[in-house]
Amino acid sequence: GMDAEGMSEEKKQDLLNQMWRNPCLNDTYEPGSTFKIITMAAGLAEGVVSLNDSFYCPGYKLVEDRRIHCANRRGHGAQNFVKGAENSCNPVFIEVGLRLGTDKYYQYFRQFGLMEKTGIDLPGEAGTIMHQEENMGEVELATVSFGQSFQITPIRLAATVSSLINGGTQITPHFGVAIESSDGETVKALEYSNGRKILDGKISETVRYILEQVVE
């Protein structure tokens, strides 16, 4: 343990704050490959990619003057979109992001609620740190497409992905379902309204299908 004797009140308070900090809400991070689900849903919704579209991965993707590598430096070779998702192939998702373009990518980023806080019933939720749209070139778009060069909270990503696979209805995470008395009787059931529709149900079903292939 830590001896609090002789510690300033400010230091004590700082340590208490750190102890109660919830990184899922209070901290942002680069989501990485988990964010490919967002690019997938946007690409399918906009019709710029379909399940059997053909891709080729030589181990990198050239974007402007940059060679952006796949995690598999030897490359995945020829694959369709579903296989590209199974392989978590960076060049495939870069290509989908570039097909969407910056304007459309931002449109879906906002549509999927990623610029908003989730509204979870806990304090201190942090916001998304994203490129300004006007400063976003093809290289930035490429890196965002597979979850790098920007930051979001884990709870924001989890809420959005849940919404994209539940039929397309935006959810707000909550902790309580009911208030109960000490003997277990329900005093009050907590009801929450449904969120807005952020993705077509058929597209949501397709996203779910692809993700099932990834883990099978």
Enumerate the language-model features and the residues they cover.
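Beta-lactam-recognizing serine transpeptidase/beta-lactamase-like catalytic domain environment
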Residues: 1-33, 38-216
